[in-house]
A protein has these predicted regions:
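Low-complexity, polybasic segments enriched for Lys interleaved with small residues
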Residues: 7-8, 12, 16, 21-22, ...
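Conformational switch/transducer regions in large eukaryotic molecular machines and scaffolds
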Residues: 24-207
Length: 207
């Protein structure tokens, strides 16, 4: 008699899929966190604290700003529109956004160099304009606004890169500069200025 065949198992050789948790929820959570982080990065920073200051105290504006944060220049919220006139009487280099051509690249460059050389304030009176328009400073030199706002422009005579061949010879020599007395001020009549700039400055409001 022929030998009996041993019956083979009919179980499929295909592996059984695990019914455990999948990675999809974790991936969705990670994507959600990335989206939230991107949204937070895109959102404007909050308005920084605003200190009230009198017109009389504006003569000490730079000192007041330095006492709060020595790495920041002052932003003045001027609802009455008198602060620019105050600075003109103090021999500052005042440029007005309201005047056509006043913020042209070469005029800005010369006003900045003059303020650095003679140790005077450079004042950008933005009036009712969006103060983010101060970014036109970058038309003078790439990333100039960053180095101006964080004061690194004053380090290692970096400001000399702004000097052109046609400028007077005194501008080519750092010995003729009084940068220790230089200051930078932005004025706005907007009670709620753009925080992309305001957050990088020390904010005051004239009472």
């Amino acid at each position: 008699m022929p030998p009996k065949k041993v019956p083979t198992s009919k179980t499929s050789s295909t592996p059984v899929k695990s019914k455990g948790t999948t990675t999809k929820p974790a991936a969705k959570k990670a994507d959600s966190q990335k989206a939230e982080a991107a949204a937070a990065a895109a959102a404007p920073p909050p308005m920084p604290p605003v200190t009230t200051i009198s017109m009389k105290a504006l003569g000490r504006l730079t000192e007041e700003a330095n006492s709060k944060d020595p790495k920041k220049w002052p932003l003045v919220i001027d609802l009455q529109g008198n602060v620019a006139t105050f600075f003109r009487y103090r021999d500052a280099n005042v440029l007005q956004a309201e005047l056509p051509g006043d913020l042209d690249a070469d005029k800005l460059r010369r006003a900045l160099l003059g303020a650095l050389r003679f140790g005077k304030p450079l004042v950008l009176d933005m009036g009712s304009h969006d103060i983010r328009e101060v970014e036109m400073v970058n038309d003078v030199e790439k990333n100039l606004l960053d180095s101006l706002l964080d004061k690194t422009l004053l380090d290692d005579e970096r400001y000399l890169t702004l000097v052109k061949d046609q400028d007077e010879k005194e501008y080519h020599n750092s010995a003729y500069y009084a940068t220790d007395r230089f200051s930078f001020v932005v004025i706005t009549t907007n009670p709620s200025p753009n925080t992309l700039i305001a957050a990088r400055m020390t904010c005051f409001q004239v009472e």
